[in-house]
Amino acid sequence: MAEAQKLHEEKPRSFRREDIPAKGYTYKDYLTWGDDVRFELIDGIPHMMAAPTLWHQRVTGEIFGQLRNWLEDKPCEVYVAPCDVRLFPEADKSDRVVVQPDVLVICDEEKLSDGKACRGAPDFVVEVTSKGTKGKDFREKKALYEKAGVREYWVVEEGAVYKYAPVDGEYRETVYDLDEDSEISVDMLPGCSIDFKKIAEFASRG
């Protein structure tokens, strides 16, 4: 009981540098924090995740739904946040990166074998931006997904989609204006595309 209380008290509630251990937190630490507050762990530093807006939830849910329908009876699986992803897993749980992408597709069932998290890079990741996450989506998380080997990464914001896929080992960006490109193909899933006209109609509801 005392140990459980100690772990609860050690849960990071602020992001002042002086409160964070010199080596940062690990996945092993992350597992002690519980579910009452959602965090991502980036290079050992906890980042609190704010409650999403209705627009964010509608867009995320519709992308997930379209992918789920397309992937029916196919070997890959699609998940929606919160779903922990250990991009650089270590056997002793000392890895210092745990993210929760908005939508992710995993084609290697071995990465899901522990039933708790995706161990290793998903094949396809979608992040839907918000005011609080936009910078992180385009910088830190893009760099992490590229390094980990995510085959395709999208950042979705109102009016545009930014697609990243590796060319000669580095992500190349393609930008889609949703006023002109209402249907965007998922390159790593040949034949699959996301209908953003349908998403816009759903997301704009009052």
Specify the residue positions occupied by each region the protein language model found.
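Gly/Pro/Ser/Thr-rich low-complexity, intrinsically disordered segments predominantly at protein N-termini
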Residues: 1-206
